Amino acid sequence: LHMIHLHWYQYPPMNPMMYPLLLVFMLITGILCLAGNFVTIWVFMNTKSLRTPANLLVVNLAMSDFLMMFTMFPPMMITCYYHTWTLGATFCEVYAFLGNLCGCASIWTMVFITFDRYNVIVKGVAGEPLSTKKASLWILTVWVLSFTWCVAPFFGWNRYVPEGNLTGCGTDYLSEDILSRSYLYIYSTWVYFLPLAITIYCYVFIIKAVAAHEKGMRDQAKKMGIKSLRNEEAQKTSAECRLAKIAMTTVALWFIAWTPYLLINWVGMFARSYLSPVYTIWGYVFAKANAVYNPIVYAIS
């Protein structure tokens, strides 16, 4: 109880119907996430043709999402059943740490996947091919930096506390001291604004490069006196259209997944009067759903 901010005491308990709904949602999300990411890991690791350096990043993404749901799914089911956090202060901190760690690792793995695609498509033969050693170094960098940022609250730079809905734990965005807020400013930049900017930048140039390539092929086809260098079926879905869809899907899903949690943190810092316990649910609902569709977007594309 000592970890719960006074702000939450002004609100009545949430509608009891919210907990069964949240429990069912988490049950479905947990099963889909664990199954989808396990299948992704198993297929990529057991299919020789798929064991490429680039796919090591996809496997790492699936691993981080799998670990996030594996460690957070059971506690959430328990707290939804009891309508409050019942697992103690220490486990609250561990729970929040693991969620932040896996979330941060997932985000930056997606960034490196995007950067690899940028390197292959935009730079082409001029770009340095991704080797197993380099991919492994990227993965190690992701986990070391994620761990460094997420362990900081244990040493006094911000802290992990129960969320307003009391079914989960996260960073403390209600404390007004400059030390706590400075962590959230930098962490928001590190796990949201910078990755989003890099992703958008890379995909803009990827689409431009593919569009230029397609135009070159059409011009070459005209010189050769044929309609297209592609067969009729491939022409129906041009490369730039498919890639544009992947790019828009990636950026849109990123925005949908992480923006609610960011907004909750920033509203908590600057306009807490608008923040009720019910609103805090949506942050991790969308973030957890991200772990479900990641294997679909990245493994297939």
From Swiss-Prot:
A Pfam family reported for this protein in Swiss-Prot or TrEMBL: 7tm_1
Residue intervals on the Cytoplasmic side: 44-55, 116-134, 205-245
Subcellular location, record wording: Cell projection, Rhabdomere membrane
Cystine bridges: C92-C169
Sites carrying sugar chains: N165
Record keyword Transport present: no
Family of this protein: Belongs to the G-protein coupled receptor 1 family. Opsin subfamily.
Subunit and interaction comment: Homodimer. Interacts with GNAQ.
Protein name: Rhodopsin
Organism: Lacunicambarus ludovicianus (Painted devil crayfish)
Phylogenetic classification of the source organism: Eukaryota, Metazoa, Ecdysozoa, Arthropoda, Crustacea
